[in-house]
């Protein structure tokens, strides 16, 4: 049926984000917000690692047929995430907070244990 692939990708993305939240909590991160949206873009997870704010992009794939998940965090996507992060910081009046951008790449084959790669400081603030 037309459009099913998009729903499958959304479901896979939601599963990946849930896996990422559990993973980050296991590392003692505090989850502050999920799926922050603004006109500039979206941030999957906003967390705190000690005193550092962490803006996390989660990419989940069933396989590497189209490359490893983290390759989907293109320069364009980095700019969108950066703009959304600046918006979030301004809304919370936290512009001076220490922050970084992480990527969590998840390979989640059907009925298999997911492979998780956490890339800290994956990219710098992009304009």
Swiss-Prot record:
Single GO term (MF): nucleic acid binding
Pfam families, sorted: UPF0102
Disulfide links within the chain: none
Domain of life (superkingdom): Bacteria
NCBIfam families registered for this protein in UniProt: PRK12497.1-3 (NF009150), PRK12497.3-3 (NF009154), PRK14675.1 (NF011268), YraN family protein (TIGR00252)
Family, similarity comment: Belongs to the UPF0102 family.
UniProt name for this protein: UPF0102 protein Geob_1494
Highest classification ranks of the organism: Bacteria, Pseudomonadati, Thermodesulfobacteriota, Desulfuromonadia, Geobacterales
């Amino acid at each position: 049926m037309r459009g099913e692939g998009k729903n499958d990708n959304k479901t896979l993305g939601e599963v990946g984000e849930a896996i990422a939240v559990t993973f980050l909590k296991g590392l003692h991160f505090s989850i502050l917000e999920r799926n922050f949206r603004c006109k500039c873009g979206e941030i999957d997870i906003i967390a705190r690692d000690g005193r550092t704010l962490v803006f996390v992009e989660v990419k989940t794939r069933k396989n590497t047929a189209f490359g490893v998940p983290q390759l989907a965090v293109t320069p364009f996507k980095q700019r969108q995430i950066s703009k959304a992060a600046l918006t979030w910081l301004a809304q919370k009046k936290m512009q001076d907070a220490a922050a970084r951008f992480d990527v969590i790449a998840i390979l989640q084959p059907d009925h298999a244990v997911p492979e998780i790669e956490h890339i800290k400081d994956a990219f710098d603030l992009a304009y």
